[in-house]
Regions:
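Low-complexity intrinsically disordered segments
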Residues: 94-163
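Phenylalanine-focused residue identity feature
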Residues: 11, 39, 50-51, 69, ...
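Bacterial N-terminal signal peptides
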Residues: 7-13
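N-terminal domain-onset segments
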Residues: 5, 20-84
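Mature extracytoplasmic domains of secretory-pathway proteins
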Residues: 65-109
Length: 163
């Protein structure tokens, strides 16, 4: 599959541009998450779904949106996720990225209730060995998006560890 990158397509519309420098890894990842999450919300409200996509905090402090495309109209989400991860690893190895965010739609068991729910997952990785997946359980009814209890778990540390 050929990897193509679409950079700065959605977030420039949202007015996201430059990150503060010298912040702790968790703070930089939270800032990146806050930058990428609105696009998932927008797509869910508009289309009821979204393809996996991502964002990266560049070493320059700029935030870039990133999408994976292999030429197919509706590739499986796992294929898109793999393309995005390949690009993230390449950016990590080259030193271009200091943090990445992979956003995708999943079904999860909410820890507090034990019930299954749709959720927006945001997998965050930072070059300073910080990795977490944040889950935003949601319910979508008639275009209205309602969040449940947000929770997180340790991430896979699969982007920057691959150096």
């Amino acid at each position: 599959m050929k990897l193509r990158w679409l950079v700065a397509l959605g977030f420039s519309i949202l007015g996201i541009g430059r990150a503060e420098t010298l912040q702790p890894p968790k703070a930089e990842c939270e800032m990146l998450m806050n930058a990428v999450l609105p696009f998932a919300e927008q797509m869910l409200k508009k289309d009821g779904e979204f393809f996996p996509y991502g964002g990266a905090l560049k070493s320059t402090g700029k935030i870039a949106s990133i999408a994976g495309y292999d030429g197919r109209e509706r590739p499986p989400s796992t294929d898109v996720i793999n393309l995005l991860k390949q690009g993230f690893v390449a950016g990590a190895k080259s030193g271009e990225f200091k943090a990445t965010a992979l956003v995708y739609d999943v079904r999860v068991v909410v820890p507090s209730s034990g019930k299954k729910s749709d959720a927006i997952a945001v997998a965050l990785n930072h070059r300073s060995n910080y990795s977490v997946i944040v889950y935003y359980p949601y319910e979508l009814k008639m275009g209205v998006l309602t969040y449940g209890e947000v929770f997180a778990q340790k991430g896979e540390s699969d982007i920057f560890a691959a150096k």
